[in-house]
Amino acid sequence: LLKNLDKVRVFDATWYLPGSNKNAQIEFDKTHIPGAKFFDIEKNSDLDNKLPHMMPKASQWKNIISNYGVKNNDHVIIYDNSELYSSCRVWFSFIYFGHNPNLVSVLNGGFKKWLIENKVVTSKTKNYNKSNYLVEEKENLIIKKKDVDSNMNTKKFFMLDARSRE
């Protein structure tokens, strides 16, 4: 990544649980990978939905990503600095909204590894011109509640709940 920072679009998708006394935006403002933009999962979700952090609508995603200046043929690299692996959520969002899966990556080891390896960081932000990002939803990547309910009888697909027991 370090050798290709000028050829890729980098996003810090760090997110912390409420009450953690950490602020991902403040951390980003202090230090981040050069050229990175902060991807605020709170603000870049479906704000019209009563539930928090829901996937934005296609029109919302188009606006969000266009405002970041990302083009459909950009290689996007996402990282985070939290234990929640929020970078994977943003990775999935790019794939769901039609970005070429070969052009979306999660930084191996995240920002922690980047820092351990003493790679360059900055507090400077880079501005990008607005783009006209095109969205093509891959609706087959999300299973709806009605499909889960139906599957209780049909056993059409295997479902695994990876949450902790708590």
Q: What do these predicted regions represent?
A:
Residues 29-68:
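Aromatic- and Gly/Pro-rich amphipathic surface segment
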Residues 18-21, 45-48, 84-87:
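Short active-site-adjacent helix-start/loop capping segments
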Residues 10-12, 38, 77-78, 103-108, ...:
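A structural signal for short, well-ordered beta-strand segments and their strand-loop junctions
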Residues 1-26, 34, 111-166:
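Flexible, polar/low-complexity N-terminal or interdomain linker segments that lie immediately upstream
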